[in-house]
């Protein structure tokens, strides 16, 4: 019965039916092979039976061992997803668990079933990274002090969540303009140079002239960062500067001195104007601030209504919306419409308008902001330098913004954290390895004989997979192996296959074809 036969051709349709299988019987394996712990098809004409490894008798914890509960045959078959694939993959030479064919098929099934998107992979990688830092429950039971480490992990997760939330808050805050008001002190000085007559020594004479300087600097408010070394240039606060001199003295073509910002403008610490003259000069200095973001001056009627003189467009729209809500001007039925009161009707020249029309209707009511006007008097005959000071309010970037940017861009702490995480992972891996070694030697110390027996069985199973040896020759050479219930079905299947094979050969020889 242990003789090896090559599988025949596919059985043809026959009117003879195979004998019904006895309950609890298993398919007959090829000679030299034993059964894997899997299910099998009940009809013999579906596939070839699959060889495999037999259960090892007398070893606790192994399927089929007396006295040790284990899953039934069909349950074990249902638990193995590669069962049908391994059946379809068997060929003439026979192969199964021992031959490596079924193992290869199951590996392919696992590889095909494990595909996923990049986001799933990233999420799995993050979970794996977190799981690598957690100590197993057995280690925590053995070492009660390890609970302190687990508490630190919980605290670390909460801290990471808090830091991430704060980083998001900072990123949102940086999207909005962060300004603070500072005092800019403007120094306007003039120096008069009297005329000089030419001398006999060859020195040339000089015409009487005067020089006007416009300079400035930010005043320290005591709240700024003392480590800030970058100082803004005076010209960076302004969009344009115009010095208007007396038109009667310098004519219509030479009485204006203008400076306007361009994309290629080089910032400077001040402006200087020099003109000839020995008479008192009245000049007007016009300074237009460079607002970032842009600000607009409201129409006087709207400014009185909202209490806003010069502001940015979002602030103006927000103030108008507050006025509408306060006076309940929004239509009760059509919420997108606004019913203008007598003041808004005079300003917008309409009784009713949509809220979406407000920005468009505001455009004619918004004007460029007024420049800062300084009247200065240049007195002739005074050889000493005369200086006048003026303080104006300007908006500068909040110093906290630079600290926020440096916090978001800093990577030194992240690198340090990654290094510490690597050390933690290595330490946890070492602990897990020591736990495995402890269980290994503890099992050996409790029952050396049974431990070595199990070890040999495990190594034999691995060796069988590596060497592609089918079946279990040690069991097959004993008579008890063939007194199991599956032998009855195996004999029936064998004779059924041989009869079908002979029938097919006879029909082929006689030229009989089945329609």
From Swiss-Prot:
State the phenotype upon gene disruption.
RNAi-mediated knockdown results in ectopic expression of type II neuroblast lineages in larval brains.
The family database entries (InterPro entries) matched by this protein are listed as: SMARCD1_SWIB_dom, SWIB_domain, SWIB_MDM2_dom_sf, SWIB_MDM2_domain
Instruction: Give start-end positions of Gly residues composition bias.
Output: 90-103
Q: Tell me what the record says results from residue 185 to A.
A: Loss of DNA-binding. Does not affect function in vivo
Recall the GO molecular function terms of this protein's record. DNA binding; myosin binding; protein domain specific binding; RNA polymerase II-specific DNA-binding transcription factor binding; transcription coregulator activity
Q: Give the residue ranges for region: DNA-binding.
A: 116-204
How this chain assembles, per its entry, is: There are 2 distinct Brahma complexes in the fruit fly, the Brahma-associated proteins (BAP) and Polybromo-containing BAP (PBAP) complexes, which are composed of common subunits Brm, Mor, Snr1/Bap45, Bap111/Dalo, Bap55, Bap60 and Act42A/Bap47, and additional signature subunits osa in the BAP complex and Polybromo and Bap170 in the PBAP complex. Interacts with sisA and sc. Interacts with mor. Interacts with p53. Interacts with erm (via N-terminal). Interacts with akirin; interaction is immune stimulation-dependent; activates selected Rel target gene promoters.
Q: What is this protein called?
A: Brahma-associated protein of 60 kDa
Q: Which organism is it from?
A: Drosophila melanogaster (Fruit fly)
């Amino acid at each position: 019965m242990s003789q090896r036969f090559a599988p025949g051709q596919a059985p043809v349709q026959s009117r003879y039916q195979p004998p019904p299988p006895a309950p609890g019987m298993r398919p007959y394996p090829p000679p030299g092979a034993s059964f894997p712990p899997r299910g099998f098809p009940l009809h013999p004409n579906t596939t070839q039976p699959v060889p495999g490894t037999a259960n090892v008798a007398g070893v606790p914890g192994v399927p089929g061992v007396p006295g040790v509960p284990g899953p039934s045959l069909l349950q074990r078959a249902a638990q193995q997803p590669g069962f049908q694939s391994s059946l379809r993959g068997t060929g003439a030479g026979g192969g199964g668990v021992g031959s490596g064919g079924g193992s290869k098929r199951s590996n392919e099934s696992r590889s095909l079933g494990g595909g996923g998107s990049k986001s799933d992979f990233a999420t799995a990688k993050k979970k794996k990274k977190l799981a690598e830092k957690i100590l197993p429950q057995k280690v925590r039971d053995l070492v009660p002090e390890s609970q302190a480490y687990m508490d630190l992990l919980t605290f670390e997760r909460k801290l990471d969540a808090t830091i991430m939330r704060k980083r998001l808050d900072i990123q949102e805050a940086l999207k909005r303009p962060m300004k603070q008001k500072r005092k800019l002190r403007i120094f306007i000085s003039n120096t008069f140079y009297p005329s000089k007559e030419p001398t006999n020594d060859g020195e040339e004479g000089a015409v009487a002239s005067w020089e006007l300087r416009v300079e400035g600097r930010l005043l320290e408010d005591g709240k700024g960062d003392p480590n800030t070394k970058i100082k803004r240039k005076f010209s960076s606060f302004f969009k344009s500067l115009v010095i208007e001199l007396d038109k009667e003295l310098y004519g219509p073509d030479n009485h204006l001195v203008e400076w306007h910002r361009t994309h290629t403008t080089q910032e400077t610490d001040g402006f200087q104007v020099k003109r000839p003259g020995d008479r008192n000069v009245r000049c007007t200095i016009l300074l237009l601030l460079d607002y970032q973001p842009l600000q607009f001056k409201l129409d006087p009627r709207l400014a009185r209504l909202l209490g806003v003189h010069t502001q940015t467009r979002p602030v103006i729209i927000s103030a108008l919306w507050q006025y509408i809500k306060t006076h309940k001007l929004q239509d009760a039925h059509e919420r997108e419409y606004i019913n203008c009161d007598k003041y808004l009707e005079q300003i917008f020249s309409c009784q009713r308008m949509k809220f979406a029309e407000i920005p468009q209707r505001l455009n004619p009511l918004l004007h460029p902001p007024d420049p800062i006007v300084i009247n200065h008097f240049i007195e002739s005959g005074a050889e000493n330098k005369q200086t006048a000071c003026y303080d104006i309010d300007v908006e500068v970037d909040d110093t906290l913004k630079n600290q926020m940017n440096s916090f978001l861009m800093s990577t030194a702490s992240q690198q340090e954290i990654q290094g510490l995480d690597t050390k933690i992972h290595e330490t946890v891996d070492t602990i897990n390895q020591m736990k495995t070694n402890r269980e290994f030697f503890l099992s050996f110390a409790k029952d050396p004989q049974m431990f070595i027996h199990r070890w040999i069985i495990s190594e034999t199973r691995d060796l069988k997979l590596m060497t592609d040896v089918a079946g279990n020759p040690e069991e097959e050479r004993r008579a008890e192996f063939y007194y199991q219930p599956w032998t009855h079905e195996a004999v029936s299947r064998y004779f059924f296959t041989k009869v079908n094979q002979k029938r097919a050969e006879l029909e082929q020889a006689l030229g009989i074809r089945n329609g």
